[in-house]
């Protein structure tokens, strides 16, 4: 499905009209999905379908006219192509986060599409049984863009300095909007939930080096909701809004791990932290990253057959 210029304005107007704005990026994605569900959208496959073309808004039609022939020449039958390469190694990379999935995320503060692992099948023309392994990529801390519950978010009044450090060191600013991302402690309750609903085989931990200068680090291991300790991720937005993080402390390592050449050479405190994540989520951390370069990524579990 194609996202057209007019969809952007519709996206912004719809969010502004909401009593509780979601905080959309205003790129027209939500409108594209809405048009798809209402069966009013236009697909790449429809560009030479005159009846569908004539349904377009004049401004969008004029814009699309510039690229129509080029786009038509680039079309392929994705389902057929996927079947052709069925015996090859193919990597599907999802966008956004598990908690923004339309069905299993923090609805209504979610994206309009399937950002869970199941979306790799529905969006690519293959069946779910064709997915051999599912990797879940996460940061060593929590981030969120836009509105919605985030129980482990740093408190602006008491943890503002920590928040600024994590945000600036991790370069946590929206790619589309440039606005600062909300940052917080790693939420292991949410991470475990994401592992369950996405059938994660292995986790991929990134930005571990963010903690290099800290004497101790903390992670959220439960929620305090009205005085009750909750260890399962709630489905209720009111519960999530009331949730206070129950934090567990870990020893820091006070060392520059970006220069480590293997996982085994990481400080023991760093390895202990990784292994706690594994125990808590019940999921192996198969890859650990301590920097942006390829040689700063340690593969602990074989990826391809």
Q: What residue ranges belong to the model's regions?
A:
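Non-transmembrane, aqueous-exposed alpha-helical and coiled segments at domain scale
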Residues: 1-305
């Amino acid at each position: 499905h194609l996202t057209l210029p007019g969809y952007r304005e519709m996206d912004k107007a719809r969010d502004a009209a909401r009593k509780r704005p979601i905080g959309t990026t205003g790129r027209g994605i939500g409108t594209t999905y809405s048009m798809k569900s209402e069966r009013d959208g236009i697909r790449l496959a429809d560009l030479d379908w005159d009846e569908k073309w004539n349904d377009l808004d004049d401004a969008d039609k004029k814009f699309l006219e510039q690229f129509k022939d080029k786009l038509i020449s680039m079309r392929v039958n994705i389902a057929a192509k996927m079947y052709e390469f069925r015996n090859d190694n193919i990597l599907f990379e999802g966008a956004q986060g598990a908690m923004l999935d339309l069905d299993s995320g923090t609805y209504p503060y979610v994206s309009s599409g399937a950002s869970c692992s199941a979306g790799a099948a529905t969006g690519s023309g293959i069946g779910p049984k064709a997915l051999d392994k599912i990797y879940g990529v996460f940061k060593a801390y929590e981030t969120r863009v836009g509105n919605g519950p985030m129980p482990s978010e740093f408190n602006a009044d008491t943890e503002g300095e920590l928040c600024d450090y994590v945000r600036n060191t991790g370069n946590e600013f929206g790619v589309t909007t440039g606005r600062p991302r909300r940052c917080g402690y790693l939420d292991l309750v949410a991470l475990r939930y994401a592992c369950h609903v996405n059938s994660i085989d292995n986790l991929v931990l990134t930005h571990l080096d963010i903690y290099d200068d800290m004497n101790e680090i903390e992670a959220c291991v439960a929620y305090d909701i009205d005085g009750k300790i909750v260890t399962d991720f709630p489905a209720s937005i009111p519960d999530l809004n009331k949730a206070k993080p129950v934090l567990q402390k870990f020893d820091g390592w006070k060392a520059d791990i970006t220069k480590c050449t293997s996982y085994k050479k990481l400080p023991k405190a760093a390895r202990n932290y990784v292994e706690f994540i594994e125990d808590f989520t019940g999921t192996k951390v198969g890859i650990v990253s301590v920097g942006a370069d390829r040689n700063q990524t340690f593969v602990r579990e074989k990826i391809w057959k």
